[in-house]
Amino acid sequence: MKRFTSMVLAALMILSLAACGDSTVTVTPDATPDSGSDAPAASGTAEYTIKVGHTLQEDTPSHKAFVVFKDEVEKNSDGRIAVELYPNSSLGSERVMFEACQMGTLEVAYGTTSVLANFDKNLEVLDLPFLFADEAAARAAVNGELGEAAAANLSEIGLLNLTYMENGIRHLMNNTRPVNTPDDVKGLKIRTMENPIHMSAFTQLGASPTPMAFTELFTALQQGTVDGNEQPIFLIKTSRFEEVQKYLSLTGHFYTAGIATINKAFFESLPEDLQTVVMDAADVAREAQYGYCDEDNISALEYLKTKMEVNEITPENHQLFVDATAPVYAEVEAEVGPEIMAIVRAAQAG
């Protein structure tokens, strides 16, 4: 339960929330949950209901992992908890769902730490460019001391870290040219998430970062509003970006962790035995999601190589990208302080 430890004053959290914008916190009342599995629905007789909202499609590793979560919770609670899954942005954007989870109108919200960092600056450290060499290193770090420190303040704003998952290592696409060096990025208008670290990194590379909701991205690429975007391999395929992007460069510039938050008051209202059921189910779902990601990334990359011009980055050119984005580390340290950055450097060192 260390992941739930509070580390900062509530006043600081209020300031963080003030930066979250004016998104309306709504949960669509007539959204239909995805049944997810063949397990019998228990909501009619259950003592508790956990609604889980996320933005991804039903065939993604994350949704499949939440099907596992649903099955584990309903089975091991003997039907005392029913789980309803709401994929595909049916309850709104990531930010809207995190806010709904904070307010208690949604029990569990899943999204990227990149978006949740708008609520808690410490989570920004997980978005640093070229932070991890590969998924194995990233998973070890976010499920260790670094991930614990990054999410420790969430309890001050009414959330708890149920579990980390992942969107994965991100790569760059565009319709102008292959990207081999930082010079190739200059002048490109790249859609980014609404995340200052991502935007700063692309600015350092000479691009024009353009934050945009994921739901608007495909149309923006079709219309040429932006030149390119960046996503994990499996998500490129499931979102059909090969239909609107010509070049895929395996830059590996960010690792995007996913995080499932649970409303603190709701979790603490559960009897201790059911708290354990929920936490254990989240652990099982996380490991399942990592496995699904590995499988999907392999098959998706093979498919994308038949649809796009794909290039790898040489070690020498990779270092050029690392050097070009190094100033972002100083920017983040000024935001979060040296203590958590020391944990970042220890995680990088392995």
Residue ranges and their predicted role:
Residues 151:
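Conserved glycine-rich "GG(E/T)P / GGGxP" loop and the immediately following alpha-helix
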Residues 21-31, 42-137, 146, 154-350:
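N-terminal secretory/targeting leader peptides
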Residues 16-19:
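C-terminal motif of bacterial Sec signal peptides marking the signal peptidase cleavage site
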Residues 1-4, 9:
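Positively charged n-region of N-terminal signal peptides that target proteins for export
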Residues 38-40:
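Glycine-rich, low-complexity intrinsically disordered segments
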